[in-house]
């Protein structure tokens, strides 16, 4: 497996719709305003967070059960920023829609700007032939409220291409998150 470069990412996005919408260079500011960077980097793609959030609350739940998750455990927020309570978390989604090639595995790493503030981004790998908006999980590990910015960079996708295509892809096995749009809650 080898990591793919900006040139490969650009070609796959433009010719095969791997990332939509696609920003072909790294954006660090818009006019006089600084933003947390997004777009193509040397060996990855920095994704943006959309303005749809689900902020965790423990008002209605006593137990968090991934096999029987209660949607009332979240408060929906639509805003340019999301405030995550101390020691809590929020779900969001990427602005970008991904179509992963059959011979590629994509790994997501949180941006250091957030990590250095105690905000951790978690995403499981994007498997071969998976497609959809990526659901992002933000953990606020601090004892203070934490702010997430919509439409700015939050994580970096790294594309690893295998020397051969897999026998069975995510699409082949009809994975439960295939084609997801918007913020997607746990499915057991």
UniProtKB/Swiss-Prot annotation:
Belongs to the dCTP deaminase family. GO terms for molecular function: dCTP deaminase activity; nucleotide binding. CDD domains: trimeric_dUTPase (cd07557). This is dCTP deaminase. It catalyses: dCTP + H2O + H(+) = dUTP + NH4(+). Its EC number is 3.5.4.13. SUPFAM superfamilies: dUTPase-like (SSF51283). The active site is at residue 137. Keywords: Hydrolase, Nucleotide metabolism, Nucleotide-binding. Catalyzes the deamination of dCTP to dUTP. DCTP binds at residues 111-116, 135-137, 156, 170, 180. Homotrimer. It comes from Pseudomonas fluorescens (strain SBW25). The keyword S-adenosyl-L-methionine does not apply. Pathway: Pyrimidine metabolism; dUMP biosynthesis; dUMP from dCTP (dUTP route): step 1/2. The lineage of its organism: Bacteria, Pseudomonadati, Pseudomonadota, Gammaproteobacteria, Pseudomonadales. The keyword Transport does not apply. GO terms for biological process: dUMP biosynthetic process; dUTP biosynthetic process; nucleobase-containing small molecule interconversion.
